[in-house]
């Protein structure tokens, strides 16, 4: 397991527990492991109850954190991937298709970063091209045609900023998705599972309900980008994060985010199955409420929600 800087003391205890577990077990060893386990639990509860916003950002980027492809089979069944935007190509930074949630059909779409070097390159580190946003929109319109809810998973450092992406209309593709998603006639639930950065996240992030995993962030710019603009150096990222209001708890207070999905103690990377279960329950509950509304009620609420954004408040 990989550890972050602020987890060094936890690592020390867990290393001791691991080494002792390989020793011949006797009453003394068992007692020591029990003692260390209790100490570890207390330390973890203390550490994660007072995380700074920068530490939350670090957790959202944890190398072992579950990505969309990890969570997909744990939340949904009968997934059938659909490819391409029918215009240019198939962007592998986003994966989408038909699936079932608690035996009910849904259209699921998620950004995928990739785990190792090969898969990171394959999925372009989760940075979508215009054809990715157009593919996502094609699947959403298909879901609308067959009256299926849409569930999107957001995890990206931003839309791909390359020249080719700009030539193919990156800004138009994102803007088109904002327009179309705001008027979809089916329930739309969006979940930030890691990084939710800039227009890259917004392109699949407009819906009836926006949920966030506890240790994720949602921002117009990365902390490093903000620090580079304000202080001319990315090294000030930890300082500016505190005033950006980008973590799940702060965004819930500002009513940008509707619900915060709890993660296992220590973060989602410590228990994929519990994380997936929490997401599945939260999404199912939201879809149940939304499905009981008429199209007019949902769209009216969605409009009111979008219009409430942008109110000024001192950070």
Curated annotation (Swiss-Prot):
Transmembrane segments: none annotated. GO terms for molecular function: acetyl-CoA carboxylase activity; ATP binding; carboxyl- or carbamoyltransferase activity. PANTHER family: ACETYL-COENZYME A CARBOXYLASE CARBOXYL TRANSFERASE SUBUNIT ALPHA, ACETYL-COENZYME A CARBOXYLASE CARBOXYL TRANSFERASE SUBUNIT ALPHA, CHLOROPLASTIC. Pathway: Lipid metabolism; malonyl-CoA biosynthesis; malonyl-CoA from acetyl-CoA: step 1/1. InterPro entries: Acetyl_CoA_COase_a_su (IPR001095), ClpP/crotonase-like_dom_sf (IPR029045), COA_CT_C (IPR011763). It comes from Francisella tularensis subsp. holarctica (strain LVS). Belongs to the AccA family. It is found in: Cytoplasm. SUPFAM superfamilies: ClpP/crotonase. HAMAP family: AcetylCoA_CT_alpha. This is Acetyl-coenzyme A carboxylase carboxyl transferase subunit alpha. Its EC number is 2.1.3.15. Keywords: ATP-binding, Cytoplasm, Fatty acid biosynthesis, Fatty acid metabolism, Lipid biosynthesis, Lipid metabolism, Nucleotide-binding, Transferase. It holds the Pfam family ACCA. Residues 36-289 form the CoA carboxyltransferase C-terminal domain.
């Amino acid at each position: 397991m990989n550890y972050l800087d602020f987890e060094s003391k936890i690592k020390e205890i867990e290393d001791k527990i691991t080494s002792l577990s390989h020793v011949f077990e006797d009453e003394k060893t068992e007692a020591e492991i029990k003692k260390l386990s209790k100490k570890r639990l207390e330390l973890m509860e203390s550490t994660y109850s007072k995380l700074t916003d920068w530490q939350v950002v670090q957790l959202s980027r944890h190398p072992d954190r579950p990505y969309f492809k990890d969570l997909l089979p744990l939340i949904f069944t009968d997934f059938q991937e659909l490819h391409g935007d029918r215009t240019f190509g198939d962007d592998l930074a986003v994966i989408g298709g038909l699936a079932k949630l608690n035996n009910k059909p849904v259209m699921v779409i998620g950004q995928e970063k990739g785990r190792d070097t090969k898969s990171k390159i394959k999925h372009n580190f989760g940075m979508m091209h215009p054809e990715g946003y157009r593919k996502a929109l094609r699947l959403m319109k298909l879901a609308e045609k067959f009256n299926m809810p849409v569930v999107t998973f957001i995890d990206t450092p931003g839309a791909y900023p390359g020249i080719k992406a700009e030539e193919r209309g990156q800004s138009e593709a994102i803007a088109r998705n904002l327009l179309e998603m705001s008027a979809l006639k089916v329930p739309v639930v969006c979940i930030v599972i890691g990084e939710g950065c800039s227009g890259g996240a917004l392109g699949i992030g407009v819906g009836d309900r926006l949920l966030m995993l506890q240790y994720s962030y949602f921002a117009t710019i990365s902390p490093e980008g903000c620090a580079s603009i304000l202080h001319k150096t990315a090294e000030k990222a930890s300082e500016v994060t505190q005033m950006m209001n980008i973590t799940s708890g702060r965004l819930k207070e500002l009513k940008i985010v509707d619900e915060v999905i709890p993660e296992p103690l220590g973060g989602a990377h410590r228990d994929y199955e519990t994380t997936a279960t929490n997401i599945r329950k939260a999404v199912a509950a939201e879809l149940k409420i939304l499905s009981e509304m008429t199209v007019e009620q949902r769209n009216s609420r969605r409009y009111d929600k979008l219009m409430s954004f942008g109110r000024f408040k001192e950070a």
